[in-house]
């Protein structure tokens, strides 16, 4: 028996989902150009994804099953590394569909076939919770247009909407190679180059919408019980919408962004979850006296904006980095938000 109840398809347009009271419609927008990412020269050291061959070598023997290692079944270049993301998101998509009855479409800014899909009303019209995942390397030049920013702003005027922004890490922003090496030694992932800067699209969207947050660094969480992330420091008094109810920790990932708040007004955005950092590995951020980084943030509705804005990294929604009851509780909170 196959794990999927229906056969997979490719190369067709999305069928709009009807509004169903009490059952949210979630959509995912991956803000990369797949051809730009997959077409990066593997001879370049920085600002590219790993090839599948590199993944297999570093994580050996995790991907030595022919399902992953046979070049007749799975791409071995950078494209293969990209496809792992889609595999990792499937359990979250299935969880949402089982909970809401609605499928979760995954849009790409530019997909494998070269089709360009802007974040416009076609994507937003049948969506209640919109995930925008900033996995685009800055070097590929993805920027939100003024029309896209206006479309998202209009989306957020609708009652009950939620925009979930997830710019990924920004490793090696310094021009000082010694600092880049310190950052690399801190996270310890051989698959991440000394410079890997993500999220140009989400940064431009964030700026256009006036969200006072910037993704910085790639920080390694403190751990307990092997590779389980240390519990979050949660501001439950500020979490009036119960985003983190029943949540103690997120899944472990070696390099996560610090969502730096760029306003002094404490009422604009709430830092609900902070992640303790592995202090055994030096990093400029910890050397400045920081012991935690901002992991989950919430902007409550304000003014003409009737919808919520949350900040959460893409890894929280990927099974590649593990799924436990705490993470499922978080997923359920996102799906059932009122």
Q: Predicted regions span which residues?
A:
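Short, surface-exposed patches at the edges or C-terminal ends of soluble domains, predominantly
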Residues: 1-338
């Amino acid at each position: 028996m196959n794990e999927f109840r229906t056969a997979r398809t490719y190369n067709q347009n999305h069928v709009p989902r009807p509004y169903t009271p009490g059952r949210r419609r979630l959509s995912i927008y991956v803000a990369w150009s797949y051809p730009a990412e997959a077409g990066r020269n593997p001879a370049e050291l920085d600002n590219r994804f790993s090839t599948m061959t590199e993944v297999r070598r570093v994580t050996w023997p995790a991907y030595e099953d022919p399902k992953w290692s046979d070049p007749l079944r799975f791409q071995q270049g950078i494209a293969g590394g990209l496809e792992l993301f889609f595999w990792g998101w499937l359990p979250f998509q299935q969880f949402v569909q089982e909970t809401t009855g609605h499928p979760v479409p995954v849009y790409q800014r530019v997909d494998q076939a070269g089709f360009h899909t802007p974040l416009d009303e076609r994507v937003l019209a049948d969506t209640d919770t919109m995930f925008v995942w900033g996995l685009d390397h800055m070097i590929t030049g993805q920027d939100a247009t003024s029309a896209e920013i206006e479309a998202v702003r209009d989306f957020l005027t609708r009652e009950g909407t939620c925009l979930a922004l997830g710019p990924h890490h920004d490793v090696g922003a310094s021009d000082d190679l010694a600092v880049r090496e310190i950052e690399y030694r801190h996270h310890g992932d051989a698959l991440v180059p000394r410079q890997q800067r993500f999220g140009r699209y989400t940064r431009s969207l964030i700026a256009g919408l006036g969200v006072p947050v910037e993704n910085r660094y790639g920080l390694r969480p403190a751990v307990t019980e092997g590779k389980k992330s240390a519990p979050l420091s949660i501001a439950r008094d500020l979490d009036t919408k119960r985003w983190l109810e029943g949540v103690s920790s997120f899944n472990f990932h070696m390099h996560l962004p610090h969502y730096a708040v760029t306003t002094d007004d404490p009422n604009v955005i709430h830092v609900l979850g902070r992640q303790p950092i592995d202090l055994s590995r030096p990093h400029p951020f910890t050397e400045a006296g920081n012991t935690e980084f901002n992991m989950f943030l919430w902007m409550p509705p304000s003014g003409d904006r009737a919808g919520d804005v949350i900040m959460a990294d893409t890894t929280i929604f990927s099974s590649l980095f593990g799924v436990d009851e705490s993470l499922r509780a978080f997923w359920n909170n996102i799906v059932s938000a009122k």
